[in-house]
Amino acid sequence: MDAAKVLAVAVPCNRINPLANFFRRGLDATWGAGLPVVAIPTTSGTGAEVTPFATVWDRSTRKKHSLAGHFMYPTHALLDVELTVSLSREDTLYPGLDAISHALESLWNKHSTPVSTAMSLEALSIAVEALPQALERPFDRFARERMQQASLLSGLAISQTRTAIAHSISYPLTSYFGVPHGLACSFTLPELLRLNLPMLVAKSPHQRTLFAAL
């Protein structure tokens, strides 16, 4: 989906020859409205179908480049649970961890808002139940559908706040060591959660049970 989102704004601006050069030189030009994008996620984790971001990995330089702006929102987002029931355990777990990371990083983000907090908390409450269920029962469509909801909600949350340190630390792990993105994001979450737990409880005291389940 990220590739489609980037190409949708790059093609009308004639910036695809080659596209990597525009990222390597820096995004100093104006990017305008692009082609319509219908985003249909086949995993439950990135939330890219509802975010104004797109990430491109430059393997030759081992760098991550991002585009962000209102012009990056897909025109439509379609979620079909049938596209996720055949996912492997890894392709269920790693994106699921990414969704949880999005929700947590949005919660303790300095840019958090009441709206982003509500979406993050709802995403977490769904994911902590639905992800183990989807891993245990891969063809449980209700669990798969709930993970799609968690992914979408956490995507909407980071659309307001962006991500935070867990994602920043994850990028070298992915680019230099090939660690899958969601797994790389999850490595630091236990310690970050420990550090931020007092703030989270103070912010949402009625969610103590949820935080204890993480």
Task: Name the predicted role of every residue range.
Residues 176-214:
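Gly/Pro-rich interdomain helix-loop hinge
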Residues 45, 152-185:
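Glycine-rich phosphate/pyrophosphate-binding beta-alpha loops
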Residues 21, 146, 186-188:
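Beta-strand segments within the central parallel beta-sheet cores of soluble alpha/beta enzyme folds
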Residues 53-161:
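Carboxylate- and glycine-rich phosphate/diphosphate-binding segment that chelates Mg2+/Mn2+
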Residues 1-82:
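Glycine/threonine-rich beta-strand-loop-alpha-helix active-site module
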Residues 4, 97, 124, 166, ...:
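A general structural signal for well-ordered alpha-helical segments in protein cores
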Residues 3-7, 11, 103-104, 127-130, ...:
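Buried hydrophobic packing segments
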